[in-house]
Amino acid sequence: MSISNQSGLDILREVDDEGQENSFLRKTTRKIQQFFKSDPGYQSRKAEYNSPAKATGDVNINVTSQDWLSKLDRNLSIENLTGKSLGIVVVSGRNKGLIKNPFLGGLVDIVMRRQDKLYLKSVEQVSSEYSPMQEQVYEFKVDMPLVQKRLGAFLKKNRVDGLSLSMHFSTGNYSLPVLIRHVLLYDYYTDDMKDSLWRAMIIYVSRQVTSNKYTKFHLWCVQKRIGNIRMYLVRPGDVYSFQGQTSWAAICNKSYMCNIQLEQSPEVSVKSSLPKYSNEPIFQSKTISQEEVGWLLFMLSIGNHARAFPIQNYLANTVMETVLPVELRCPFLSRSVDCEIFQKNTKRRVMEKWRQEFKKDLNVCEELEFKNVKKSGYMQPLFDLTMPLGCFDSLETKEMFYLRHNIAGFQADLTPYPMRI
């Protein structure tokens, strides 16, 4: 064997031995990494895919302070815009009047579109006056096909876990933090997972109907899947419109405020989207308030701008402060581990970490299912999984439910159905 051939064999042996620290392959890899890292733009390009939020300071995102808000702009009339009456009755004269901005101090977010890009500005304020203590501007930027393909492959590989979590969503065995996390990932999931999340949201809203935080009209809207799914986590009573500016809306309470630029004005929504639903029987019942119509127009008008609304900021500063902490790494996600799936090159160990987090959510749901089984005292047949726990899956009243199942002794109220698994 010649000397040159012997040298070539030595190199091949070194390439094959990847376990050696000074192997030819490892040396070459380190050199390539050092070359790319020496590029000043490497870190910025790498960070671009760390999460949907790309921090930027080059865009001016400001909105005039709104001291007065309204539930529905007084100049916006369904009858005037459509040329016909929908039979809507105004329940309270307060709905058309101006309301003092309830925000007293805390976190303020602004969602705005500039040059076909969505931006979110987060500001810490000590009062409703514009006195920012700390602020940050993010651009919402996602390689949608990449993330959808990645999560599709994940659910295909982990089909059993995916189906199990979907079943728990569909039957009401979930905690609110688990629901919030996966609702924020809704746009990147497969159609089957999206369908289960809508079923979970129907359960969530129906439970809120029984506690008088939502109405039957809101339940009808979520059943029709109107608008962006995450906006159903916002209490309808916290949604306002700007005074004299129908292209802007506000979501606010005493400790949180978000000013959102709508994707299309309510006037456009009335003419383009509302006619699809105006012939529904619920619109002829004459029980819908003007405030509910205003909320519907908000849901139809916000469009894809809802993707940039940080729902976890709203919840963390209102009812979920002790349950859902705000993670500063990305304002569009609820957990840091979710940022990893947005990287351009996701390593196998990263998806394994995400799988473990997915498994934790599944374990939480299974524990809730076990507790509900013990509480109810009996198992629901496998073929009868259409009725979620403690809620209405349709506009069927409790009386109708008892009559359909031939159960005597019903009461005329809106308490939940008997728990069944």
UniProtKB/Swiss-Prot annotation:
One of its GO terms (cellular component) is cytoplasm. InterPro entries: Meiotic_expression. Keywords: Cytoplasm. Pfam families: UPF0300 (PF08594). It is found in: Cytoplasm. Its main location: cytoplasm. Belongs to the UPF0300 family. This is UPF0300 protein C737.04. It comes from Schizosaccharomyces pombe (strain 972 / ATCC 24843) (Fission yeast). The lineage of its organism: Eukaryota, Fungi, Dikarya, Ascomycota, Taphrinomycotina.
